[in-house]
């Protein structure tokens, strides 16, 4: 919204800098006001549409987080770079419904994927006998959402986590 207001002020400044010292009838100012009001309506509609889609996705998955794959198969370091570049995160389910939403992606694709488990996680879904540091220092989820220790060099499905703070 600030960008729209600054753009409007810039246009007015350009108008005045180009030798139009006056706007006796207020046509330029009124035009800028009309444009700004139109842009505000477009912004409100876009925000409403975005939130509607986000709420629908959240409702359908039972999670405020979205887990999305690009269908690539990569190791942990490549996953980290891909998710960072996409402005997402390596999946880190904190609740059972988030883990279920993550597992749904894995089940649909029939593949395993990496996740990150925080030190203070209130929710875990380790498979029997896990964690097993001998298997590796990374963590992967299977198609049922169970967590297993894994090598960080394994090539697994790329899944990134996205969430919104509004």
Swiss-Prot record:
UniProt family annotation: Belongs to the alpha-type phospholipase A2 inhibitor family.
The protein's assembly and partners: Homotrimer; non-covalently linked.
Record-level GO cellular component terms: extracellular region
Keyword flag Magnesium: no
Primary location: secreted
Signal sequence region: 1-19
Ranges where the C-type lectin domain occurs: 46-161
Protein source organism: Bothrops moojeni (Lance-headed viper)
Keywords tagged on the record: Calcium, Disulfide bond, Glycoprotein, Lectin, Phospholipase A2 inhibitor, Secreted, Signal
Protein name per Swiss-Prot or TrEMBL: Phospholipase A2 inhibitor clone 03/12
Tissues where this protein is expressed: Expressed by the liver.
Cellular localization per UniProt: Secreted
Residues of this chain annotated as glycosylated in UniProt: 122
S-S bridge residues: 83-160, 138-152
Entry keyword annotation includes Hydrolase: no
GO MF terms, alphabetically ordered: carbohydrate binding; phospholipase A2 inhibitor activity
Entry superkingdom: Eukaryota
Known function: This phospholipase A2 inhibitor binds directly phospholipase A2 in the presence or absence of calcium.
